[in-house]
Every structure is written in structure tokens, then in C-alpha cells.
From Swiss-Prot:
Gene name of the encoded protein: glyA
Catalytic activity line of the entry: (6R)-5,10-methylene-5,6,7,8-tetrahydrofolate + glycine + H2O = (6S)-5,6,7,8-tetrahydrofolate + L-serine
Subcellular location: Cytoplasm
Protein name, entry field: Serine hydroxymethyltransferase
Residues involved in (6S)-5,6,7,8-tetrahydrofolate binding: L120, G124, H125, L126, S353, P354, F355
Family: Belongs to the SHMT family.
A GO cellular component entry from the record: cytosol
């Protein structure tokens, strides 16, 4: 069954859009830190007949008949997730990381309770108490940030804020923090003020699974994550706990609390991705992700572009463009013109608005999936520096784009199987 061929015949307009997107991915350097390239096996699971099945409830406790096979798939996804993160409980049904976080809030909090997370402009996330998100509208959100000198977590300040505000829930885990997170220190603070501790490891889940970043499971009451990004699976969410009995309370907050029927085709794809992440090759991949990020950071620093915190411990490289008198909005446009995809991002203590910003966030997960090594990322760093430091030079712009296309041809995105099915 060639689904894409059927799509071409049934809806050539959508088929052509998909082909165009595939071409864009092949001919651009994907440096958005939250993106990656799922395997063909993961994509096949997503596009399977499982999309036809309703399965409200949990395995063996469904509200619909005919769930014997999706039960087995979901149970396998749960088993693999628990093994991957050394957890005793898992729920694989959340449609996204935001949905996973919402389910946790529903279980542990009441409207008006105080939650404490990192300020969005310092590297936090919308769902950690931003005033534009339900987490900031329904709860009393207080925020901590990073040290102004080091751009790293300041646990003395975090403790002071916690002691003063007495949050019901403390959130650690970020969207633009390039350093290792000390979960044990957060646990100590949470215990001191009597708070629940939640880790949102959406960005670093693959590194945690590979044991290249400390695991929050032993220290946190609950852990949430997405299943794409460094984990390289389908777009979706996941909730994990060390305490199986405590974890059961989140089952009801996922369904019927915040969702209806689970997406069993996505859960199958999650199971495939978890299986891939349990293989030794995935550890090698994760190691390369970090090596590549360090090379990218050092290359840019050597060209006179500041990096927030002076480097990175994970896949994220956050440029502070105030060092070259440029905004993130302009930098994002400049690199996009030479087929590099990134995103403007606030930096700690940013004087610019979130629509302009002083930063550019880069990530190495996607290109590492394509096979990029340290030498390739050194070239990526040089291309970015050449473009940003010469914004008005059309010749350098043209040369940068040629160098990007050379790298794209050197590291093709997918093997011939996908190529043949889309043509």
C-alpha cells in the first residue's frame, strides 16, 4: 500500500505541498533546537491503520471494543518508556508536552495555587506560568531566573524566592537553557518549602535517556516531556513517575481530565521511537549531538559572537547578538536567506521585546541525525558567522548559500525508500 502514491492521485495539491516541504528539509540546515528528523519507521507507524481506532481509557480498561491490538501496542510503549527513563510508571497518551503539563497541573493544583518556574525570557516555557498561557491565568505564577554574570541557575536566589512565595509546585526544565540542570538542588528546595517538584525535560529527554544528562526521575515527583526533539520520535507528550501509585493520579487527569481518545497511531510511533532510543546507536547519536553543539559554540565565540553562559552542555547554543549590535529578528532573517532555519529568542535580561529579541537559538539534534560531525558543524558555525558579520554583502550571502547546499548534498536527509515513495 503506497499511501503517498494514493495521496498524489487523490489530492495532488496536498501531495505537492508535502513534496515541497520534503525538498525544503533536504535543502536547508535545520537548526531549530526543538526539531529533529523522525525515522522512516516512526513515520510509517504514524501513517498506519491505527489512525482509524478509537480507544478511550487505558489498556485493558477501554470504553470501546476492538482494542486488543492497540492495547498491546500501548502497553509496549509504556514498558519501553519506563525502561528508557528508569521510571516505575508512565502515561504515553498526552498529545503534546503542553497537554502533559496541563494534566499534571490538573492533578496537583487548584486554581489560584502558586507555581514557580523559570521566567520565559530567561529560558523558561509558556506552560510554566506565562501570563498568556492557562498556567499563568489559572495559577499564581512566580518566576526565577539565571545569574546575571554567568547566565546559569542561581540556587541561592531560587531558594529565597521559594521561601518567600511558598509555591505548591516548582517546575524545572527549560526551552532555552544550555547548561546541566541540578535536579537534586531543586529537590532540596522543594522539600524545604513543602512543594511538589516537576521536571519538564522536553528538550533534553534524549540526552537523559542516553545517560548524558542527570535523570530527574529519582528527584522529581513527576516528569513530563515531548517525544520529538532530542528523543527523535513523533510529536507527542509523555508523563513519567518514580512512584507508580502516585503516578496513577495522572491517568485520570489525562483522560477524561484534559483529553478524549488517545492517538493510537502516534502511540505506536512513540513505541517505535522508544525502541530506537534503547539501542546502543542512540547513545552514540546523543554523544555526537553534544560534541557538535560544543564545536558550534566555540566556532561562533572565536568569530566574536557571544554565547549565553559561554558555551553549552546539551544541544542548545544560544547566541547573544548584542555583541555584534544585531537583533534576533534580523539574524533570523539573514540566516533564512541562506537556507538556515533557526529562531529568534530572548536572552536573559533582554532589553528587546519577544517579537524582536537579542538572541538566536540554535540546536544540533536535527543535523546530527543527518550525519553531521564536528568538522561539518565547524563549517556551519563559520557560515553563520560569515552571514551575520556581513549582512549587506550580497557576494558573501551567495557564497554562504552555496556552502549550505554543499553540506546538504553531502549529508542527505533520507534514504532511497522515502525518496521512491514520494516521487
Amino acid at each position: 500500500m503506497n499511501i503517498l502514491q494514493n495521496l498524489k492521485e487523490s489530492d495532488p495539491v496536498i501531495s505537492n505541498f508535502i513534496k515541497s516541504e520534503k525538498n525544503r528539509q533536504e535543502t536547508h540546515l535545520e537548526l531549530i533546537a526543538s526539531e529533529n528528523f523522525a525515522s522512516i519507521a516512526v513515520m510509517e507507524a504514524q501513517g498506519s491503520v491505527l489512525t482509524n481506532k478509537y480507544a478511550e481509557g487505558l489498556p485493558q480498561k477501554r470504553y470501546y471494543g476492538g482494542c486488543e491490538f492497540v492495547d498491546q501496542i500501548e502497553e509496549l510503549a509504556i514498558q519501553r518508556a519506563k525502561k528508557l527513563f528508569n521510571a516505575n510508571w508512565a502515561n504515553v497518551q498526552p498529545h503534546s508536552g503542553a497537554q502533559a503539563n496541563a494534566a499534571v497541573f490538573l492533578s496537583l493544583l487548584k486554581p489560584g495555587d502558586t507555581i514557580m518556574g523559570m521566567d520565559l525570557s530567561h529560558g523558561g516555557h509558556l506552560t510554566h506560568g506565562s501570563p498568556v498561557n492557562m498556567s499563568g491565568k489559572w495559577f499564581n505564577a512566580v518566576h526565577y531566573g539565571v545569574n546575571k554574570e554567568t547566565s546559569e541557575l542561581n540556587f541561592d536566589e531560587i531558594r529565597e524566592i521559594a521561601l518567600e512565595t511558598k509555591p505548591k509546585l516548582i517546575i524545572c526544565g527549560y526551552s532555552a537553557y544550555p547548561r546541566t540542570i541540578d535536579f537534586e538542588s531543586f529537590r532540596n528546595i522543594a522539600d524545604e518549602v513543602g512543594a511538589f517538584l516537576m521536571a519538564d525535560i522536553a528538550h533534553i529527554a534524549g540526552l537523559v535517556a542516553s545517560k548524558l544528562h542527570p535523570n530527574p526521575i529519582p528527584y522529581c515527583d513527576v516528569v513530563t516531556t515531548t517525544t520529538h526533539k532530542t528523543l527523535r520520535g513523533p510529536r507527542g507528550g509523555l508523563i513519567l513517575c518514580k512512584d507508580a501509585e502516585f503516578g496513577k493520579k495522572f491517568d485520570k487527569s489525562v483522560f477524561p481530565g484534559t483529553q478524549g481518545g488517545p492517538l493510537e497511531h502516534i502511540i505506536a510511533a512513540k513505541a517505535v521511537a522508544f525502541g530506537e532510543a534503547l539501542q546502543p546507536d542512540f547513545v552514540n547519536y546523543s554523544q555526537q549531538v553534544i560534541k557538535n553543539a560544543k564545536v558550534l559554540a566555540s566556532t561562533l565565540i572565536n568569530r566574536g559572537i557571544d554565547i549565553v553562559s559561554g558555551g553549552t552542555d546539551n544541544h542548545i547554543v544560544l547566541l547573544d547578538l548584542r555583541s555584534i549590535n544585531m537583533t534576533g529578528k534580523i539574524a533570523d532573517l539573514l540566516v533564512s536567506e541562506v537556507n538556515i532555519t533557526a529562531n529568534k529568542n530572548t536572552v536573559p535580561f533582554d532589553p528587546e521585546s519577544p517579537f524582536v529579541t537579542s538572541g538566536l537559538r540554535l540546536g544540533t539534534a536535527a543535523l546530527t541525525t543527518r550525519g553531521f560531525n564536528e568538522n561539518a558543524f565547524a563549517e556551519v558555525g563559520e557560515i553563520i558567522a560569515d552571514r551575520l558579520l556581513n549582512p549587506d554583502d550580497s557576494l558573501i550571502e551567495s557564497q554562504c548559500k552555496e556552502r549550505v547546499l554543499t553540506l546538504c548534498n553531502r549529508f542527505p536527509l533520507y534514504e532511497s525508500k522515502l525518496e521512491a515513495s514520494i516521487k
